[in-house]
Structures are given as structure tokens and as C-alpha cells.
């Protein structure tokens, strides 16, 4: 493949003004892999909340111009000969989409060490939806020192990350209590914002995984922890105050821990080593993708409109697809 061949990509030329979407479809040269790198033909690439934040100038470490996108599924077409033709999927910490060109393009370069075989029972669209949600979920649980005997309270259990947290925790043997704004979970925060029903279900909670980042709800969740409990959170409010107040006596008397989790601190190789360990779980049906919330979009102005919908708090999981898969 020659360098002068071109591809379509969703790209930022410069840092957007605050709150403005700074992406556009451009034609750029297809990148060429160096030693130790692979060229992947992207078949599908999910749009994550962090992609939206990046596309609106929300990160200080993005280097411009830059192709956006962290998650992907596709086929290796150039690089190590034993991997050419392999279907792969993956994700990234603060490299793809930030300091290296990302996955919202027809082709992308990844390190050979970061290549992960795609689960055989997933479509490209499904596989592209796994990366950020499942690695973030694993990180939140592991940083929360979660054990198989723990009772885990999952705030935002119906979201992409929350659903992944529930599946992983249950696979580890934990008892899971689900929390959301919906009546389909154990606790509905619309009618029980203080999470009082927790005590009807269990005596205490060992771990809280908060995927929402609402200060008042986070405080309510913290109050449910027993001695030695851990609260692990992955998000903060996008608007309004980002301050969180807590009872200092409660923290030290109950020996509690409050832990922040940021998947962007993982390297490409570290992120994908987590995914590699999950492949068998997907193939065994223990981990599943939330298909009902996925909507496919194309690498045209349509995907830019999908970004705009996400700016308006749309809960759909958009996946950019390059062809039928």
C-alpha cells in the first residue's frame, strides 16, 4: 500500500472553542506501519463520552491536528505477516485520539503488542463497543479492591460502563445491587435519591462503583458503605459544581476509601492487555454488549450529527461503521 493513497477520517485541526464541536470529515493519507506496528482496516469504531469531550476541546493533552476515536474493531492488513488477516478489536488510554491518530477513520496504526483477537461471537459493531466501557469497569472494580465475597453497589447500572461493571462483578462472584433512574433496577434514584432501600436488601455495602458522578448521589452512596468500604468513581459533573463534600468523621471512623479511576492513564498496551483477558468471557457468553442501545452511523456528516446528539445528552451508543458487518 502506497503512502499517497487516501482515506476518510474524522479530524480536529485545532483545539475547539469551549463547548464547540471541532471535528470534520477530511481526506488524509493512509498511514504506513513502522517496525512493530500494524495497519488496521477499521470496520467499526464506537463514539464514547471521552471522544465527545475530546472533540469539544475538553482535554489538555490532545496534540493537534488529530483524528479522534479510542475504540475500534477491524482487520489487520499490513505489518507482522502472522497477524495479517486477523480480526482485532481494541481501545486506548491517552494515546489514540490524543497524541496519536485515532480510530474514527478508515485505517489506523496500532502497536503489534496491542493487537487483540476479536471474540469470534461478536460482530465488528459489537466488538467496537467493548473497549472503553469494559476496561473502565475492570479498572474501577480492581482499584476498588473488589473481592468475590463483596456486595457491590453500582450507580448508573444501565449505562455502558455500569452494565460492564455488573457483569464483571457477578462473574467474580459478587452480589450486585443496581442503581439507576429506572424502575428496572434494584433502586430507582428518582424515588429514592438517598438510596435508603439499600438497607432493605443488605446490611452493608463493601464497594460502590459510581459511573454517574453526581455529587449528591455520590454522597448517598458513600453513606451505604460498611467498615472498610471503598467508593470507586469514574466521572464528574459536566456542568455546575464539581465539588463533593463528605463527613470526615465517617471516613476515618469507618476506614473508608474514595478512589478516582481514569482509564486515560493506561497505555495502549496496558488497555488492550485487559481486553485480551476478556475475550474468553465474551466467547463463553459471560460478558455481553448492550445491543439495544447501539445505533450505527457512517463516516460522513451523519457521524458528526451523532456527536451533536450526544452533546444534547442522548443516551444512544453510536458506532461508526465503514461497511456491512
From Swiss-Prot:
Its EC number is 1.-.-.-. One of its GO terms (cellular component) is cytoplasm. It is an enzyme of class 1 (oxidoreductase). It is found in: Cytoplasm; Nucleus. Gene3D superfamilies: Medium-chain alcohol dehydrogenases, catalytic domain. This is Zinc-type alcohol dehydrogenase-like protein C337.11. It comes from Schizosaccharomyces pombe (strain 972 / ATCC 24843). Belongs to the zinc-containing alcohol dehydrogenase family. Quinone oxidoreductase subfamily. It comes from the Eukaryota. One of its GO terms (molecular function) is oxidoreductase activity, acting on the CH-OH group of donors, NAD or NADP as acceptor. Keywords: Cytoplasm, Nucleus, Oxidoreductase. InterPro entries: ADH-like_C, ADH-like_N, GroES-like_sf, Lipid_raft_assoc_Zn_ADH, NAD(P)-bd_dom_sf, PKS_ER.
Amino acid at each position: 500500500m502506497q503512502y499517497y493513497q487516501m482515506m476518510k477520517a474524522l479530524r480536529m485541526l485545532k483545539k475547539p472553542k469551549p463547548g464547540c464541536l471541532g471535528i470534520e470529515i477530511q481526506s488524509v493519507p493512509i498511514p504506513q506501519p513502522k517496525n512493530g506496528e500494524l495497519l488496521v482496516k477499521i470496520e467499526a469504531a464506537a463514539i464514547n463520552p471521552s471522544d465527545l469531550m475530546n472533540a469539544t476541546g475538553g482535554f489538555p493533552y490532545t496534540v493537534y491536528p488529530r483524528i479522534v476515536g479510542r475504540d475500534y474493531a477491524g482487520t489487520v492488513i499490513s505489518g507482522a505477516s502472522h497477524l495479517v488477516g486477523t480480526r482485532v478489536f481494541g481501545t486506548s488510554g491517552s494515546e489514540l485520539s490524543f497524541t496519536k491518530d485515532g480510530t474514527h477513520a478508515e485505517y489506523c496504526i496500532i502497536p503489534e503488542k496491542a493487537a487483540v483477537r476479536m471474540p469470534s461471537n461478536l460482530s465488528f459493531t459489537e466488538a467496537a463497543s467493548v473497549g472503553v466501557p469494559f476496561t473502565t469497569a475492570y479498572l474501577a472494580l480492581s482499584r476498588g479492591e473488589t473481592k468475590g465475597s463483596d456486595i457491590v453497589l453500582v450507580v448508573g447500572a444501565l449505562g455502558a460502563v455500569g452494565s460492564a461493571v455488573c457483569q464483571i462483578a457477578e462473574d467474580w462472584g459478587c452480589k450486585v445491587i443496581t442503581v439507576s433512574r429506572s424502575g428496572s433496577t434494584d433502586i430507582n434514584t428518582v424515588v429514592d435519591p438517598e438510596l435508603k432501600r439499600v438497607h432493605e436488601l443488605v446490611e452493608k455495602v463493601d464497594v460502590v462503583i459510581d459511573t454517574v458522578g453526581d455529587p449528591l448521589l455520590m454522597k448517598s452512596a458513600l453513606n451505604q458503605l460498611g467498615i472498610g468500604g471503598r467508593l470507586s468513581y469514574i466521572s464528574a459533573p459536566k456542568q455546575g459544581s464539581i465539588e463533593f463534600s463528605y463527613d470526615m468523621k465517617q471516613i476515618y471512623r469507618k476506614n473508608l476509601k474514595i478512589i478516582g479511576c481514569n482509564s486515560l492513564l493506561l497505555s495502549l498496551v496496558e488497555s488492550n492487555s485487559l481486553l485480551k483477558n476478556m475475550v474468553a468471557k465474551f466467547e463463553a457468553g459471560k460478558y455481553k454488549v448492550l445491543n439495544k442501545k447501539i445505533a450505527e452511523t457512517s463516516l460522513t456528516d451523519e457521524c458528526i450529527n451523532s456527536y451533536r446528539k450526544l452533546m444534547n445528552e442522548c443516551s444512544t451508543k453510536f458506532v461508526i461503521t465503514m461497511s456491512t458487518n
